[in-house]
């Protein structure tokens, strides 16, 4: 989950667990660790890492996240962990950056959601905006794993969200 620090400036990613079938409320959740799982450290992340989405591939936990606040611009990064507590970024650059000026995601590529389909393919759904959040679009890209994480453009891209 993502939460701000006590000064309400930096958004950081923490980890928690709860028993199956619990409400995962304040009294049901338990911290995974004392430390923060991921905090903004790179220039493009600004003061915010949020919207964590994970997928497990070959025993590694990949965490996709939005870096920087909405439309400042937000871009998508990726970190990896063997234990779900200690994460390292796969790159110092965004995995999915904002688009060029005038494109559907020039203000933001953010709020990722990772999904593995029945065939084992992994897709990353995310939102984009070209007008500082007045209009939002949803896109889907396929993720390939190997010696590095690669994003492939898929057949569904930049559909307007109602």
Feature locations, PLM:
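Conserved beta-propeller blade repeats
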Residues: 52-53, 112
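Beta-rich carbohydrate-recognition and catalytic domains
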Residues: 1-47, 55-107, 116-162
């Amino acid at each position: 989950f993502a939460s701000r620090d006590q000064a309400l400036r930096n958004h950081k990613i923490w980890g928690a667990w709860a028993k199956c079938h619990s409400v995962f409320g304040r009294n049901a959740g338990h911290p995974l660790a004392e430390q923060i799982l991921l905090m903004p450290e790179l220039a493009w992340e600004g003061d915010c890492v949020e919207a964590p989405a994970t997928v497990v591939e070959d025993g590694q936990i990949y965490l996709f996240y939005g870096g920087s606040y909405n439309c400042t611009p937000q871009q998508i990064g990726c970190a990896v962990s063997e234990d779900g507590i200690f994460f390292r970024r796969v790159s110092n650059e965004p995995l999915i950056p904002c688009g060029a000026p005038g494109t559907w995601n020039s203000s933001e590529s953010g709020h990722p959601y990772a999904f593995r389909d029945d065939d084992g393919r992994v897709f990353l759904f995310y939102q984009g905006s070209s007008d500082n959040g007045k209009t939002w679009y949803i896109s889907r890209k396929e993720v390939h794993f190997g010696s590095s994480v690669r994003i492939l453009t898929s057949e569904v891209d930049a559909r307007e969200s109602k």
